[in-house]
Curated annotation (Swiss-Prot):
The lineage of its organism: Eukaryota, Viridiplantae, Streptophyta, Embryophyta, Tracheophyta. This is Zinc finger protein 4. Seeds over-expressing ZFP4 are insensitive to inhibition of germination by abscisic acid (ABA). The keyword Metal-binding applies. One of its GO terms (cellular component) is nucleus. It comes from Arabidopsis thaliana (Mouse-ear cress).
Amino acid sequence: MRPILDLEIEASSGSSSSQVASNLSPVGEDYKPISLNLSLSFNNNNNNNLDLESSSLTLPLSSTSESSNPEQQQQQQPSVSKRVFSCNYCQRKFYSSQALGGHQNAHKRERTLAKRAMRMGLAGVFPGRGSSSNYAAAATAAALSCLPLHGSGNGNMTSFRTLGIRAHSSAHDVSMTRQTPETLIRNIARFNQGYFGNCIPFYVEDDEAEMLWPGSFRQATNAVAVEAGNDNLGERKMDFLDVKQAMDMESSLPDLTLKL
């Protein structure tokens, strides 16, 4: 005989077992590995339980995703501000103290060179205190105009401009060719406690000027025309009288010829 199977009882027992298995959901705070229920059920109430299980599965996944990205957490933290060092001369900013120290040492070297050139320039401008050469003063002034003085502004150059030194024109200084009256007097020959001509040095050559020697048979008009460049009238008369005196002396000599 065949056994009689009651399908209604088996279906009801299967549904009850599925309900019991589906109701087993984690409630505690500590999440443990969850086993998924793959059994099929025909009750509509089981949909809510599946939603709870899916939500419980998503929570640990989100926590692991946050812990697996430490770079994002570092980006969210506030960035530390870098220290900035500023120069005392030109207010330039540096990010390291070593770079600032080298920059300020360059400023100090420029300042020492400027002071040295200033002393040399003052010694050339005031001859009593140092070198009396005007060329040295012009050279030092030209060197001063080329110095790059960072952070000092135009203070140093204005102090030199008050002394009469101008940039880009000291090389063509006219004062080198000028001479004081004292130096001109020293270079002039003295005759009879006076000076020759209108302060003209004796070494100046004049092509038109000719010497009038005594005993020459030149006419007086030519003698005056030769010395027309001279402004001193007394000297012209003196030369003319000297010629006449020389001619009279020759005529006043005694005649020593023998006459028979």
